[in-house]
Structures are given as structure tokens and as C-alpha cells.
């Protein structure tokens, strides 16, 4: 080996090995401090790509497990609501069985029907208000897709159904006997509604004249109970003409009039009935809205083919119905043109009136034209058909209404086979509850499977990217020893060129 000074090859070799051991020591320390075998792609390029795919899959499956738990929660929420609906249906069935007993009086049947109506209303409330995170679960038919996997198409569907008295076929459930309207009814501007059994009797013209005073001529009277509960009497003709506040004495069966309080009802109309008359408790009050511009709606009526429509004979009225229990039910707005009423909507805030001119004909085809209040095909008119319940006239397949200015109920029918209908409703609820129970079991199974998959994928990823501490500690110890030895050897290698100096002495 040549003796040279400029190049110390032994020192260079030692430095190179020292650098390698230092790099190995740095890698071992990094892996021990991070716990990962792969801290960057240079550590294991292929392993890093594989581990990253494992990570994406694991994260997706973990979220899918949470999704499945949400699916269980929404199914449990829906099933809980259905349980309450079932409880109400069970009570309705119990009441229907009770109503079938021949010992019930009409008053008993009325009470039973009233509770049935309340129970059905509660079913509708539960159906319309039960929600999960803003999603109404029983208000309409709906399919909720729950993602239970890390890839597209890995889903479980929850089929939700609208559950209400209508979809259960019980919205027209009636356990009362059929009835026929009385001969006499209250008439308000030719809009007639016949119903009810309780009556009151207005006194004769003579009694009314005596109460008002001898100055009245052509006296006629009818007591109309408006929404504020006040009775009024309309007196026509003579110096005493006007509308008076009145009270009705249930004991004496007489109408008493306050002669000091003659109230001009510019916004109300009462129908005159001559002589002694029987008036049902199912009365209609017509209230005219003041200050409403009817020019536009009159033009709409004319455009719809209604002759004689102008702003002077067109007004907005609001019809109210009072059932035999004294409950006032708002019948909605209508446009009065002459003796006819047309369905309309009224914006209280904007003081705007709009005629309802769309209706469905007998073939179910949407048509355009003025919709008369009481029309059998119209979708906008509202009437009260049975006590405590409001329907669209077009929905009443067991009621017959005359179109035009008069609205008259001819008859109502007792529901045939009510227990059979209730049993069918219970079966419908049970079917949906069974489906929800089954889908909860599917979610539980999916969650268990997802947990097993996540565990196995995590183990596989760990073998690829996690540090083996036994190996890395061994590598670190080896690198440290090599560092110490290399440093010592490098010092000796750097002394080799000094041997050449001995040749120069």
C-alpha cells in the first residue's frame, strides 16, 4: 500500500461507515419516538400506499357503524310513536265494542263518539309531530337510506309509512246512529245547514213586540249566536227596527231583549223567522269583512264566467258553524256575490283577497272556474259534516251536498263493521312495527360485522406501519455501538498519514 499524505482513504472509509450508523441510529430513534415503522413514503413506498387504503376503509367502516346506530335510533323513535298510536287504537276499539251495546242512549253514543274523535285526533297529532333530527317519520310515506358500509351501494333502507286516521281508514269512523235533519233549520242568506237534535224556541211576534214596545211594526225575529257567544235579535220595520242584543233563558224558554242596547251590526246578517220557530244549535253565522277591495275578485268572477259580478255586489264573508255542544268551528272564507258563495282565501296581513278558481271535476281532471261553496267537486270549500270534525266537501263520499247558494246535509251513515275497520288499522300498525323491529335487528347485525371487520383491518394495518419496538431497540443499540466504535476508529485513521513523517527524519 502506497504511503500518501493527500488522500487518507482509511479515514474516508471510516467516515462513510460512521454516517451509515448515524443514519440507522436516527431511523431507529424516529420509529421509537413515533411508534410508526412508516413515517414517510421513503420508509416503505408500497407499504405506505397499502396502509393508507386500509386507513380509508377503517374510517369509512367506523362511520358506517355510527350510521347504523343512528338507524336504530330513528327506528326506535318511530316504533315508540307507533306504540302510542296502537294504544289509542286499542281504546278506540274498546269504545267501538261499547257502542255496539243496545243499551246505549243517544247521549251515550255522543259521548263515545266524542272520545273516539279525540283519540283519532291524537293519532293524527302523533303522526304529524313525531320527528327524528327534523325528519318527520310518520307524516308521509318515505324511504330513509342508511349507509352501513365503506363503499357505494352498501346500504339498508328504512321504509316509513304515513300513519294517520285517514290512512288507517278511520277518519270517517262513526258509531252514532244515522239521523235525518229536522224540518226547520237556521237560514243565513240561503246558506242552509241542517243538523243536530237540541232545539231552542223563539217566542212569538206578540211577545217580542211587548218586550220591545208597542211602536214596532212588521216585527220578525231570529236568534243567531255569533262567535263571541252573544245572541242577537233582528227587528224589521217601524221606529224600533234594528238588531238588539238578546239573552235566552233555558228555564223559561224565552228570549229577553235589551231595549236599551240596539246594536247596528253592519258586519253581520241575521235571518228573520216569523212566528214561533224551532232553531237547531247547529247555526251558521255570516260575518262580512269590511275594508276589503273586492274589485279584483269581482273581475276574477267575471273572468270565470259568473255574470253580474262587480265590486258593488261582491263581498268577502267568513262562515262559522256551531255544533250542538256549543263549539264554534271556522268554516273559512267565501266571496258572496248575490245569493251565491264562492270559495276564496284571504290574507289578513296583506288585506288581499283571492278567489279559489281551481277545482277537480268528476273525472279527477283539474279545471279552472269559480268554485261555488258547497260544490261536490271543489277542493277549496270547507264544511262541517259531523260534530267536532271538519272536512273538505269533496272528501265526503257518504254525504250529499247541493251546489249553488244552499249547502245542505241530507244524511250521515253509521260506519258499517267498525270493529273490522279498526282491526285492519291495528294490523297496519303492527305490520309497520314488525318491519321496524326487523330492520333494527339488521342494524345490530351490521354493527357487529362492522366491528369485526374494523378490528381485522386495524391489525393488518398495524403489521405494515407500526413499529416493532423489540427490533427497533435492537437496531438503536447496534447503531449506538457502531457510532462509538466508528468515532474511535476514525481518530486512529486520521493518524495514519503521520507515519510518512518518519521517512523524512
UniProtKB/Swiss-Prot annotation:
Individual Salmonella serotypes usually alternate between the production of 2 antigenic forms of flagella, termed phase 1 and phase 2, each specified by separate structural genes. Its main location: secreted. Signal peptide: none annotated. InterPro entries: Flagellin (IPR001492), Flagellin_C (IPR046358), Flagellin_C_sub2 (IPR042187), Flagellin_D3 (IPR014981), Flagellin_N (IPR001029), FLIC_barrel (IPR049365). GO terms for cellular component: bacterial-type flagellum; extracellular region. The keyword Secreted applies. Gene3D superfamilies: 6.10.280.190, f41 fragment of flagellin, C-terminal domain, f41 fragment of flagellin, middle domain, f41 fragment of flagellin, N-terminal domain, Flagellar export chaperone, C-terminal domain. This is Flagellin. GO terms for molecular function: structural molecule activity. Flagellin is the subunit protein which polymerizes to form the filaments of bacterial flagella. Pfam families: Flagellin_C, Flagellin_D3, Flagellin_N, FLIC_barrel. Keywords: Bacterial flagellum, Secreted. Belongs to the bacterial flagellin family.
